[in-house]
């Protein structure tokens, strides 16, 4: 099930409510981690950069998804797929559950959010970025191999791949200051749809592209929400829960 707190239609609204409320607070609450002022200052700088990247990635995910639906390269097939999927709720649920990052347990309720630690949220972001690292590389490779693929789509895929790497570096640096025991090589979900993405059968390949862009968009918006929420927790701690 798509976590109710981070649905594409609601995460932006939640984030705006959350951040607008913070401007009313003059006194910064205690941070959720034990660290020196110097380390907290470094973390703030890292999160400032991370939130910019996550926001850019989220927007690119939305734009690329729209390009697939609007460009003649893929629009006919994509619109047919979405019509078929919406013939039943079961089809939609099955499609979402096929996203390879579903095993990453993002909190589904406000109560779950409150029970989740700062470090656990960090690990979610780390695992999600790692889970997309190789798939994004393959996406760029396969789109580049399609002569009819427009640059408008390919360029978005290339930008997302590059920014995913950059954001991953920032998250790893943040983790090194919060808890070095969290390792980059921890288990994370693996993607197993490369054969479909490389398929010579257009219908199979385009369905793989449809699902790829669908799952990617959801996850990029999730990452953006989580990175901003982590920054809020670092700066304001419990105040961040006040708008949920």
Curated annotation (Swiss-Prot):
Give GO terms for biological process: blood vessel endothelial cell migration; negative regulation of angiogenesis; negative regulation of blood vessel endothelial cell migration; placenta blood vessel development; placenta development
Name-wise, this protein is Prolactin-7D1
Cell compartment(s), UniProt:
Secreted
Tell me the keywords, alphabetical order. Answer: Disulfide bond, Hormone, Secreted, Signal
Its family remark reads: Belongs to the somatotropin/prolactin family.
What SUPFAM superfamilies does the entry give? 4-helical cytokines
Top-rank lineage group of the source organism: Eukaryota
Disulfide bond residue pairs? 99-215, 232-240
Note the Pfam families from the entry: Hormone_1
Major localisation: secreted
> Is Cell wall biogenesis/degradation there in the keyword field?
no
């Amino acid at each position: 099930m798509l976590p109710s707190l981070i649905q594409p239609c609601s995460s932006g609204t939640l984030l705006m409510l959350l951040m607008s409320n913070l401007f009313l607070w003059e006194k910064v609450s205690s941070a959720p981690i034990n660290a020196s002022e110097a380390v907290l200052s470094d973390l703030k700088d890292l999160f400032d950069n991370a939130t910019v990247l996550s926001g850019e990635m989220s927007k690119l995910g939305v734009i690329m998804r729209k390009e697939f639906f609007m460009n003649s390269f893929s629009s006919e097939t994509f619109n047919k797929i979405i019509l078929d999927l919406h013939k039943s709720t079961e089809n939609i649920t099955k499609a979402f559950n096929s996203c390879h990052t579903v095993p990453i347990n993002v909190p589904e309720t406000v109560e779950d959010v409150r029970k989740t630690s700062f470090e656990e949220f960090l690990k979610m972001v780390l695992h999600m970025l790692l889970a997309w690292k190789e798939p994004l590389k393959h996406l760029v490779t396969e789109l580049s191999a399609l002569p009819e693929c427009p640059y408008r789509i390919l360029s978005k895929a290339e930008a997302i791949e590059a920014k995913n790497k950059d954001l991953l570096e920032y998250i790893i640096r943040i983790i090194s200051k919060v808890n070095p025991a969290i390792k980059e090589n921890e288990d994370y979900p693996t993607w197993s749809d490369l054969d479909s993405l490389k398929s010579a059968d257009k219908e199979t390949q385009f369905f793989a592209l449809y699902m790829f862009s669908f799952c990617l968009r959801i996850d990029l918006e999730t990452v953006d929400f989580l990175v901003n929420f982590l920054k809020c927790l670092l700066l304001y701690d419990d105040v961040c829960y006040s708008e949920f």
